[in-house]
């Protein structure tokens, strides 16, 4: 029961991140948002691991798995999500992201030979239909934000890759260490992009207070607490079952965005 509560809390906090991103985007561009949130999350995560006595040494042979996982998420995932959310509404972004739990069993079937049920296939078809309805209803026509929608789907595929790769590590390492190294490697991957494209601009920015609060939330909760809770869920429930709760994300986002962003 505690594990389920942890996963549900992770999804609630994640749902809020789609709205909070919009406040961060008032001052920062997408790459800066992602790099700064990861930069904040790394000391938070390693500090928490040290204080809680959960610090673990990574075996040399496992670094390649950590790197591949970090390449999928946060690197590719956040590139897709951050730029995608700058082009589509918070609610639409969350609805697209919500198809992740339905794609994970399909990917697991082909990549790690997990059983795929008929219900998984039916759910995937229904989910894609629902996403299409939201896109048409929100934008008037599919092509209205085609680039943003495509970027969100790239984020979805990256999250699926991350979830499959995480299955290799969750039974060896605790969620805090996995998330800490994931954020560290992700920050290193984003560092060249940040230095080349946005470092000088950030130095001369007049940042609105709400943007700093938003980036702090994204770093501590979005890239820290959420991943710790979710990784624990994968460990106890399995990838497919843990991802089922992702259906809560668009619901939370829709409610919060209605009150905070006035999105219908």
Model-derived features: positions:
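Specific transmembrane alpha-helical segments of multi-pass solute transporters/efflux pumps
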Residues: 13, 17-18, 46-97, 133, ...
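C-terminal-most transmembrane helix of multi-pass membrane proteins
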Residues: 5, 34-39, 46, 50, ...
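C-terminal transmembrane-helix exit sites in multi-pass transporters
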Residues: 47-53, 100-125, 251-264
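Transmembrane alpha-helices of multi-pass small-molecule transport proteins
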Residues: 27-76, 103-107, 158-165, 179-198, ...
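Glycine-/small-residue-enriched transmembrane alpha-helix faces in small-molecule transporters
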Residues: 1-35, 142-168, 188-192
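Hydrophobic transmembrane alpha-helices of multi-pass small-molecule transport proteins
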Residues: 45, 67, 116-138, 190, ...
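Membrane-interface helix termini and inter-helical loops of multi-pass transporters
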Residues: 19-30, 85-87, 135-145, 196-210, ...
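Helix-helix packing/entry segments at the starts of transmembrane helices
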Residues: 11, 34-36, 78, 92-99, ...
């Amino acid at each position: 029961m505690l594990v389920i509560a942890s996963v549900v809390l992770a999804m609630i906090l994640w749902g809020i991140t789609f709205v909070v991103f919009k406040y961060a985007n008032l001052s920062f561009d997408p790459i800066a948002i992602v790099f700064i949130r990861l930069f904040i999350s790394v000391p938070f995560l390693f500090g928490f691991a040290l204080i809680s006595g959960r610090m673990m040494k990574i075996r040399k042979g496992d670094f390649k798995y950590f790197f591949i996982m970090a390449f999928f998420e946060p690197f590719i995932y956040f590139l897709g999500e951050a730029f995608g959310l700058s082009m589509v509404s918070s609610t639409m972004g969350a609805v697209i992201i919500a198809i992740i739990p339905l794609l994970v069993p399909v990917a697991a079937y082909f990549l790690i030979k997990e059983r795929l049920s008929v219900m998984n296939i039916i759910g995937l078809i229904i989910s894609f239909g629902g996403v299409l309805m939201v896109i048409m209803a929100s934008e008037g026509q599919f092509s209205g934000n085609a680039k943003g929608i495509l970027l969100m789907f790239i984020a979805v595929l990256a999250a699926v890759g991350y979830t499959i790769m995480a299955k290799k590590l969750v039974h060896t390492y605790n969620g805090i260490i996995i998330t800490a190294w994931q954020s560290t490697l992700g920050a290193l991957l984003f560092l060249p992009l940040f230095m080349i494209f946005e470092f000088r601009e950030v130095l001369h920015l007049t940042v609105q207070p709400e943007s700093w609060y938003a980036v702090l939330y994204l770093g501590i909760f979005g890239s820290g607490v959420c991943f710790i809770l979710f990784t624990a869920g994968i460990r106890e429930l399995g990838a497919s079952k843990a991802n089922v709760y992702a259906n809560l994300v668009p619901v939370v986002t829709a409610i919060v965005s209605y009150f905070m962003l006035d999105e219908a």
